[in-house]
Swiss-Prot record:
GO terms for cellular component: plasma membrane. Keywords: Cell inner membrane, Cell membrane, Membrane, Transmembrane, Transmembrane helix, Transport. The gene is mdtH. This is Multidrug resistance protein MdtH. Disulfide bonds: none annotated. It comes from the Bacteria. It is a multi-pass membrane protein.
Amino acid sequence: MSLVLQARRSGKYFLLIDNLLVVLGFFVVFPLISIRFVDQLGWAALIVGIALGLRQLLQQGLGIFGGAIADRVGAKPMIISGMLLRAAGFATMAVASEPWILWASCTLSALGGTLFDPPRTALVIKLTRPHERGRFYSLLMMQDSAGAVIGALIGSWLLAYDFHYVCWAGAALFVLAAAWNAWLLPAYRISTIRAPVREGMLRVVRDRRFLTYVLTLTGYYMLAVQVMLMLPIMVNDIAGGPGAVKWMYAIEAALSLTLLYPIARWSEKRFRLEQRLMFGLLLMTLSLFPLGLSTTLQSLFALICCFYLGSIIAEPARETLSASLADARARGSYMGFSRLGLALGGALGYTGGGWMYDMGRSMNMPELPWALLGIIGMLTLALLYWQFSLQVPCATHQPRSS
């Protein structure tokens, strides 16, 4: 086996373990924020929505800067410092007794993610070949789902004792992830050239196709982030307690572990990336319209299953399509900027979702926020169809970056 092949293989194993630690650390804490501050402390959903939206907007919106710096200095120092900063954010959240403290903790967490997320994503592109990238993304997403339910189970168990333990567990996992990277991650360069930070950023913003694609995904992310805000609140309301929330993530894990990889392999041979992304988004959108009318856990979980299935179809295609559009000369910058749609969609989805949920409750119209989200999904589908119809379809197996 050549040294290059050996490095790729060991690198992929490293990425899987690193990803598991990051996912566990995140999902121990974040799914329980809305339950802790809305249901247990009685804060308005809007306040918590602002905190979650602020985290999303800062982390993903500033990602291009983190990616551009990583293009210049390499992945390792950015990843380690970012993980330690997120650990500090979680430790601060443990003592959040006022909204501004919660917002500050989410800001620290966001800045940490700004540093470590783009170089980690760029490493996936560097260490995988184009033809295997989609399947590796599927493996990572399967791991995300399993890690999400395990993290939520750990967090729910710790929440029964004290929310402090939830935050400290999340912080400890990110410190462990930082130590893992400090010990084993080589000093990889994630781009083919070592260009100035400004040059990498300019290369991205001049790429009109990539820019349009990223901004169009804002609506997609407005739907996707409700897994962290409105869906847990609704499950909690119908069940009468937070214990059922872990089953929501268990459903996602079961579907992902059994269907994600087979669906990705089957569909990549038969459909273009654009078609897979749009069909998944359509399924997510259609599942939202009747969600507000659910009165039992059975009907609610059935619709959540449809939502997750749409995400299972769309996510590998979306991630692979983003990688295929990235320029290898500025991988970090491209992967950082690719999160801008998540930044905007997350901020709007969290703050708007919290506001719509409060509004629907005050007007005794629980279906209102879900209907509005469904309309947003339909508009996003129309924009994606228009964008893809004007461009040459992206090949499934031959991305530009390698």
